[in-house]
A protein has these predicted regions:
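Conserved C-terminal guanine-recognition region of P-loop GTPase G domains, centered on the G4
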Residues: 56, 61-124
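A short, flexible beta-alpha/helix-coil linker loop
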Residues: 45-46, 97, 135-139
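Conserved catalytic-core segments of large NTP-driven translation/proteostasis enzymes
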Residues: 115-174
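Hydrophobic face of alpha-helices
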Residues: 49, 73, 108, 152-160
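P-loop NTPase switch module centered on the Walker A-proximal segment
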Residues: 1-66, 106, 110
Length: 174
């Protein structure tokens, strides 16, 4: 169905759909408030490190997506290390806050601890936090439960506020 296709557009590889993970980096674009935002979904696992590094070389910021029940996983640490090394600003997204076992406040503390463990420069620790139920397209600022009629507007607004536009002259030769 069309709905199933839309749900899995970023997981187009058969193995990705079967395993429920991202293996190959993929891009999508969305227009928001007159700005074209390019999103790149990367694998999180160090096993696919080449894909992560290629994707991070093309972006100006990261959405650090963390399950509100599971908390940061080893791949969270790996991707965060690479993003900080590239001096990319992060927006922390606590996803699946609607799960019965969600513990968003504790998970956010674990994320702060991860930033501290990695000895991240202070300017990276001042990140916006978004709570989300991504599969339903709902988000809100801070730690909380998005309203039933919420949209992804808070997430897209955070991207516009946090991630600087690319610098360069589009008319200049490559």
């Amino acid at each position: 169905t069309h709905e199933a296709l839309v749900d899995r557009v970023m997981d187009s590889n058969d193995q990705e759909r079967e395993r429920g993970i991202t293996i190959l980096a993929k891009a999508a674009s969305v227009h928001w408030k007159g700005v074209k935002i390019n999103l790149v979904d990367t694998p999180g696992h160090a096993d696919f490190g080449g894909e992560v590094e290629r994707a991070l070389a093309m972006v100006d910021g990261v959405l650090l997506l963390v399950d509100a029940a599971e908390g940061p996983l080893p791949q969270t640490r790996y991707v965060l290390q690479k993003a900080v090394a590239a001096d990319l600003p992060a927006i922390v997204v606590l996803n699946k806050v609607d799960r019965a076992d969600a513990r968003p406040e504790e998970v956010l503390d674990e994320i702060y601890q991860l930033f501290m463990d990695l000895e991240v420069p202070d300017h990276h620790i001042e990140f916006p936090v978004i709570s989300a139920v991504a599969r339903e397209g709902r988000a809100c600022e801070g730690v909380g439960m998005p309203a039933p009629d919420a949209t992804l507007a808070p997430l897209l607004d955070a991207v516009l506020k946090t991630v600087l536009a690319p610098i360069g002259d589009p008319a200049a030769p490559l």
